[in-house]
Design a protein with these regions (language model features):
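Phosphate-interaction motifs
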Residues: 1-108, 269, 285, 321, ...
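Flexible glycine/proline-rich
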Residues: 3, 81, 204-351, 359
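Short coil/turn connectors at secondary-structure junctions
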Residues: 5, 29-31, 43-46, 51, ...
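Phosphate-binding glycine-rich loops and their immediate beta-loop-alpha structural context
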Residues: 79-187, 348-367
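Short Gly/Thr/Asp-enriched flexible loops that form oxyanion-binding sites at enzyme active sites
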Residues: 194-206
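Short glycine-rich, flexible loops that bind phosphorylated cofactors or substrates
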Residues: 42, 96, 193-195, 343
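Short glycine-rich anion-binding loops that position phosphate/pyrophosphate groups of nucleotides
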Residues: 39-40, 125-126, 190-196, 237
Length: 367
């Protein structure tokens, strides 16, 4: 047992006659032992009187003016953690508070899942590094930086490689190097003709290509395979397509390497402000801007192009339209998965119309 307070440890039956009118004088070493918070309590004592409730007489004597009860200000053995108690379960993400509990429980080492290293290969003859003087036809590589930030946010360790030109042998060698050095490899396709053929051919020749194209939009051209028992994902070059492939395919993969499951996004019910058409062939993810009007959410679809980067920046959430559904009419209640907090959404002014820089300035001032 240990002391829960700074004070003195003593036998409670020696204090029963103490009161405001009858102060009792106790002697150190004979009646009590000075203790600090956390100190072990000798077996002959059964309570602790706080230092605030003592009157110091001299170095070896104190007065008490109220009685104490057994176990007063004492933390019994096992109050916090008992022997063989489970402190944290397996496949649990260690939080700062868990570290304290583990050490308090006498655990100084434990086995953990290794953070997966994720190799990121940007490809394309037209792709150039940020800061490069641009020529006609050049495209700045920003996808690989976005991927790196996402991988890090999800608990992985990103390893970004230099841009690889559209050449089978160059891509093959880059993939071989990345497979050797990482647990997962992401190949980000360029937009030039034949680009996907190089990626799929390399995966097929070095390992096995399981999937080339899925029925989601954006994100249709995704490729999935394995080389040397390591997952290889070919990610479309369009940024919105790339985002949803990362969210829907790569994120769960990175989490699985850590023994974790992805958490479901918060869902709110919102009324669609305008008609939203969809192809019958694909399960579609539609970015929306949310407003909170009259105690209800309203959702306005944003630009739906796969290359519309700002639609991701501006989106408060997204709705999903299943395959075989042609679209959703205005006024329909839909489920929206949130990308922004509800507090932010509820404090957003809703303006629907053509873009005006004044709106951006006002929004920045109000932010």
């Amino acid at each position: 047992n240990s002391s829960a307070m700074d004070g003195i440890a003593l036998k409670s039956d020696k204090t029963f006659q103490a009161s405001d009118r009858n102060h009792m004088v106790l002697t150190q070493g004979e009646d009590y032992l000075v203790v600090d918070t956390g100190d072990p309590i000798p077996k002959e004592f059964d309570c602790v009187v706080m230092v605030e409730d003592l009157i110091k007489v001299d170095e070896n004597h104190v007065e008490i003016y109220q009685s104490a009860v057994p176990w007063q200000n004492i933390r019994p053995l096992g109050e916090d953690i008992v022997e063989n108690q489970l402190i944290v379960p397996s496949k649990h993400k260690i939080r700062p508070v868990d570290i304290g509990a583990l050490i308090a429980g006498g655990i100084n080492e434990l086995e953990v899942y290794k953070k997966p290293t994720v190799g990121i290969i940007p490809t394309g003859t037209e792709i150039v590094e940020p800061g490069t003087e641009l020529k006609v036809g050049d495209i700045i590589d920003f996808n690989s930086r976005t991927f790196s930030a996402q991988v890090e946010e999800w608990g992985g360790i990103p390893r970004r490689y230099g841009i690889v030109k559209d050449d089978y042998n160059f891509i093959k060698q880059a993939v071989l190097n990345a497979v050797e050095e990482n647990d997962i490899v992401l190949i980000n396709a360029g937009s030039s003709a034949g680009r996907e053929d190089f990626t799929s051919s390399v995966i097929r020749d070095l390992g096995e290509l399981f999937i080339h194209g899925v029925a989601i939009k954006p994100g249709k051209p995704v490729m999935m395979g394995v080389i040397n028992n390591k997952p290889i994902i070919g990610i479309p070059g369009y940024p919105v397509s790339a985002y949803f492939v990362m969210e829907e395919i790569v994120k769960p993969l990175i989490y699985s390497f850590q023994g974790l499951e992805t958490e479901d996004k918060k869902v709110v019910r919102a009324t669609l402000t305008r008609r939203c058409m969809s192809s019958l062939k694909y399960h579609e993810f539609v970015r929306v801007k949310l407003g909170y009007i009259g105690g209800k959410y309203v959702a306005t679809p944003l630009t739906r192009g796969a290359g519309a980067t700002m639609s991701l920046v501006n989106a408060d959430g997204f709705l999903e339209i299943d395959q075989s559904i042609e679209g959703i009419e205005a006024g329909t209640a839909v489920n929206v998965k949130l990308l922004s907090s509800e507090d932010k959404i509820k404090n957003t002014l809703v303006c629907i119309g053509s873009h005006d820089p004044i709106i951006d300035i006002a929004a920045d001032i109000m932010h």
